[in-house]
Structure formats: structure tokens, C-alpha cells
Amino acid sequence: MTTGDCCHLPGSLCDCSSSPAFSKVVEATGLGPPQYVAQVTSRDGRLLSTVIRALDSQSDCPFCRICHEGANGENLLSPCGCTGTLGAVHKSCLEKWLSSSNTSYCELCHTEFAVEKRPRPLTEWLKDPGPRTEKRTLCCDMVCFVFITPLAAISGWLCLRGAQDHLRLHSRLEAVGLIALTIALFTIYVLWTLVSFRYHCQLYSEWRKTNQKVRLKIREADGSEDPHHSLLATGLLKKVAEETPV
């Protein structure tokens, strides 16, 4: 059975009626408990996670609204004003989601998170600059630069040597022609290098703005948790218990 319910996750492409990349599939068989299958995608269509877990109708434990896993190994937080099944989230999952969606607030209740953004290093952009066309352009320009630079240097050196020889033989016309050819060659090479470098600098600047490491400034739940978070966790447990189908 395939349900048409849509998971309103931050930054998701929420079109469950036509998109198979974000759906819930419940298989009721006699071989085992029903399973929950969820695929989470970001704004640019990249698959962030695929989650398969067994459903337990008697369970009243909250789970992360992004990865749909419980508090196994990592505590669940309630960093915003969302309640019910959308109120709990892992800190690492939320950081990954905010980094992928390039936002700093909850897109459901619009609560602004206290985050610290750090730009990613240049090596990550060189490994994965983005779309396939940009990656192909970067590779081609780097290969051309590696091969054209020594060719331009050798060609210019040969032209200048030829111009010197023609000057010794009093062939000024040929010498002027070789010097003009050298100047034109280096002008074209410098212009191509500057245009290519400026183009890739713009791509890197845009990539750096939209691909940052996001760190939440939220203290995870521990023994010294404040009463506000305790009340949120208690209300979340009650809300999930009420919404759990029997």
C-alpha cells in the first residue's frame, strides 16, 4: 500500500503525488512487520538519505523527522516550535539539512536557529565543483592550461630567436613579423587565462556561499537540561502517543 501523505521536511521537494523520490511505502506481509521506506531529497534533487525501518504501532517513542530513526546513539532535540512527529530531530541530521538547503531557520515554524557557518575548503570544490557541465569545463580548462602554457612559452622563445637571427642578417621585415607574432600569441594566451580564471573564481564564490559547514549552537540534552526542554520532550511524547494509529 502506498500512502499519499507528504512529509513536510525543511527544504524538501514536497510533491508526493508525482515524485517517487519522496514517498512512503508500507508493505503488509505475513513474513514480518510492516516496513517504512522514505527517500529524502534536497532542493537540487540530490538524494540525501534512504531510510527503511519497521513500523511498530505500539511504539510511542519519538523519531527524527529527517532520518526517521529514534534516539539510538544520538539524543533527539526539539530546537524549534514544531510539535508532534515533526518536533524531534538529531543535531547532526539538522546540521546536514541546513547545510544542504542553505538556510538557518525552520521552514515550518520559521524559528531562527543559532548557527555557525564555516566555508568549505578549496579541495572539496576541486573534487566536486557541482553540476556535470561545470566539472567538465573545469577539467578541460585545467588540461588546456597544462598543455598550452609550455607550448606558448616554447613558441614565443622560438619566435624571438628567429627575430634575433633575422636582425643579424639585416632582414628587418621578417624580424618585425616574428616579434608581432610573439606579441599576439602571448596576448591571446593571457586573455584566455584571465577569462578562464575569472569564470572559475565566480563559480567557486557561488559554490562557497551555498556549500558551508553548519554547526548548531544548541546544547544536547543531558542531566543539566533546562525545564523548558524537558517540557518540550514530555509534550512531544504525549503528542506522538496520541497520533500513533492503533
From Swiss-Prot:
Zn(2+) 1 binds at residues 64, 67, 90, 93. Zn(2+) 2 binds at residues 80, 82, 106, 109. It is an enzyme of class 2 (transferase). The chain crosses the membrane at residues 138-158, 175-195. GO terms for cellular component: cytoplasm; cytoplasmic vesicle; cytosol; endoplasmic reticulum; endoplasmic reticulum membrane; endosome membrane; Golgi membrane; lysosomal membrane. Pfam families: RINGv. Its EC number is 2.3.2.27. It is found in: Endoplasmic reticulum membrane; Lysosome membrane; Endosome membrane; Golgi apparatus membrane. Residues 121-246 are annotated as: Required for interaction with IKBKG. It catalyses: S-ubiquitinyl-[E2 ubiquitin-conjugating enzyme]-L-cysteine + [acceptor protein]-L-lysine = [E2 ubiquitin-conjugating enzyme]-L-cysteine + N(6)-ubiquitinyl-[acceptor protein]-L-lysine. Interacts with STX6; the interaction promotes MARCHF2-mediated ubiquitination and degradation of CFTR. Interacts with MARCHF3. Interacts with GOPC/CAL; the interaction leads to CFTR ubiquitination and degradation. Interacts with CFTR; the interaction leads to CFTR ubiqtuitination and degradation. Interacts (via PDZ domain) with DLG1 (via PDZ domains); the interaction leads to DLG1 ubiqtuitination and degradation. Interacts with ERGIC3. Interacts with ADRB2. The RING-CH-type zinc finger domain is required for E3 ligase activity. E3 ubiquitin-protein ligase that may mediate ubiquitination of TFRC and CD86, and promote their subsequent endocytosis and sorting to lysosomes via multivesicular bodies. E3 ubiquitin ligases accept ubiquitin from an E2 ubiquitin-conjugating enzyme in the form of a thioester and then directly transfer the ubiquitin to targeted substrates. Together with GOPC/CAL mediates the ubiquitination and lysosomal degradation of CFTR. Ubiquitinates and therefore mediates the degradation of DLG1. This is E3 ubiquitin-protein ligase MARCHF2. It comes from Mus musculus.
